[in-house]
Regions:
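Internal amphipathic alpha-helical segments of the cytochrome P450 catalytic fold
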Residues: 48-49, 138
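Bacterial N-terminal signal peptides that target proteins for export
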Residues: 1-10
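Short solvent-exposed beta->alpha transition segments
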Residues: 33-34, 49-108
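Second-shell loop/turn segments in exported
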Residues: 25-26, 37-41, 54-62, 116-118
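Bacterial N-terminal signal peptides
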Residues: 9-18
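Short, low-complexity N-terminal intrinsically disordered segments enriched in polar/charged residues
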Residues: 2-3, 19-45
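Exposed beta-sheet edge and beta->alpha loop/turn motif
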Residues: 90-147
C-alpha cells in the first residue's frame, strides 16, 4: 500500500509538473494525454481509492471515496482488461460557479477503448478523464466516465 501510494504521488507530481501553472490554452495536448493514461492505468489496476485520494477538491465534493470506488468497479469489472486504447479528443472548458472549488478550467481527454469482455472484443467504449486546475495552479484528476 505504501509503495502504491508513493507511486501515485510520484505520478501526480509528474502530472502537476507537466501541467501546473499553465493556463488551459497553454497546456500541451500530449501532456494531457499522458496524464489521462496515468489515471486510466490506475483504474485498470483497481487503484481507484488512491486515485480519489489525489483528486481535486471539486471531485471529492461530488462523490465519497467509497462510492467512487464502488461505481468504477461496477462499471469496469464486467468489461475485463483493455485490449486497445487510443485517445480521440481533448476538450477544454471554463466553468463559472459560485463555489471556488468547482469554478475554473477543466480539460478532458477522451479515449476509445476495446476491452476483453465486450462483444467478441469488437465493440469499443469511450473513457473520459477530466482534470481541474485547482486554485493553487495545479491540474488534478476530477472525473472518470465510461460510456
Amino acid at each position: 500500500m505504501k509503495r502504491t501510494t508513493i507511486k501515485l504521488l510520484f505520478g501526480l507530481a509528474l502530472l502537476a509538473g507537466w501541467l501546473g501553472g499553465a493556463a488551459a490554452q497553454d497546456v500541451e495536448a500530449s501532456d494531457m494525454v499522458r496524464g489521462g493514461l496515468q489515471v486510466i492505468q490506475l483504474v485498470d489496476q483497481g487503484k481507484t481509492g488512491e486515485l480519489w485520494d489525489g483528486a481535486a477538491p471539486a471531485a471529492k465534493k461530488r462523490v465519497a471515496r467509497a462510492d467512487f470506488m464502488a461505481q468504477i468497479s461496477k462499471l469496469r469489472g464486467p468489461l475485463g482488461m483493455p485490449l486497445q486504447r487510443t485517445w480521440v479528443a481533448i476538450n477544454r472548458q471554463v466553468v463559472a460557479d459560485s463555489d471556488a472549488d468547482l469554478a475554473g478550467q477543466y480539460v478532458s481527454v477522451e479515449y476509445e477503448t476495446r476491452f476483453t469482455n465486450t462483444a467478441a472484443n469488437r465493440a469499443s467504449m469511450r473513457e473520459l478523464v477530466s482534470f481541474h486546475m485547482d486554485r493553487d495552479g495545479i491540474w488534478r484528476f476530477s472525473g472518470y466516465v465510461l460510456r
